[in-house]
Amino acid sequence: MQQVVYVASPESQQIHVWQLGAQGNLTLLQTVEVPGQVQPMAIAPNKRHLYVGVRPDFRVLSYRIDEQGKLTEAGVASLPGSPTHLSTDNDGRFLFSASYSGACVSVSPIDADGIVGEPIQQLDGLEGCHSTNIDPTNTVVWAPCLKEDRIRLYDLGSVGELSIHRQAEMTTVSGAGPRHMAFHPNQRFAYCVNELDSSVDVYQLDAASGDVQKVQTLDAMPAGFSDTRWAADIHITPNGNFLYISDRTASLLSVFQISEDGSTLTLTGHQPTETQPRGFNIDHTGEFLISAGQKSQHIEVYHIDQHTGDLQPLARYAVGQGPMWVAVLALD
């Protein structure tokens, strides 16, 4: 499997494009100078485009991906707020942008050539909205709102319009601050990391009714941790066996084993990582994790033990200034 890793560094306005080798080694393919502070990235489902959010002029850039994984800018469109998170629906027809500071979610069309157009809908009043996440059925968008301690749910219509889902929201404990999400491959469970108390919530999805219920909440930090909690990112291995969460104050990656049915997490350990790990990701084989240090100007690659989920550091690589986002593409 040929894989490419994209690392966004807003302070130097760059995307570094790396080839990921079979042993976890990285080879630099390209350094892209971006017209703006690049932050969130999303890969199109058909793997032909990379969508990038930039500021201070709030825009989304569409990059064409060639057969090697290299990028060529192909389009630009405006966004209503500073982009905090980008995602698409599973068919690649619509781009969703969450804006934390703008307290909004927007929907933009993606044309037949894979280029994002101007927004067609804007939902306001979502305080601290931190991400938009399409569910496995491609029908419901989950929008964690950190300042509201709740996840809002929206139905996705045929032309991209979002409307309030029958179950309008799920609430967290007070002060948790829901942020980023991941879905289990079996499509029956979702996981949300809470930024302000560094916990993770497990949600069960009822495919028949569309209802959601919280079934577990677990602390991600070591016992006795007394510093400020500041969780950031969450990802799950493709086989659904392991889940990881990053905390920026502690510069740690928390390791969880997932029960066979996906319903239960067990915290098994912690791995020190790059300073202030705001973003990380897992490759498509489930063998490697790439962590970005927002304050270290480096990324680090780890091998994932397939029996325990433990992380073995392999190598560090210098990138741009303030790296915040990691995306991984499987070319074949």
Curated annotation (Swiss-Prot):
It is an enzyme of class 3 (hydrolase). Gene3D superfamilies: YVTN repeat-like/Quinoprotein amine dehydrogenase. Its EC number is 3.1.1.31. It catalyses: 6-phospho-D-glucono-1,5-lactone + H2O = 6-phospho-D-gluconate + H(+). GO terms for cellular component: cytosol. Pathway: Carbohydrate degradation; pentose phosphate pathway; D-ribulose 5-phosphate from D-glucose 6-phosphate (oxidative stage): step 2/3. It comes from the Bacteria. One of its GO terms (molecular function) is 6-phosphogluconolactonase activity. GO terms for biological process: glucose metabolic process; pentose-phosphate shunt, oxidative branch. Keywords: Carbohydrate metabolism, Glucose metabolism, Hydrolase. It holds the Pfam family Lactonase. Catalyzes the hydrolysis of 6-phosphogluconolactone to 6-phosphogluconate. Belongs to the cycloisomerase 2 family. This is 6-phosphogluconolactonase. It comes from Pectobacterium atrosepticum (strain SCRI 1043 / ATCC BAA-672). The gene is pgl.
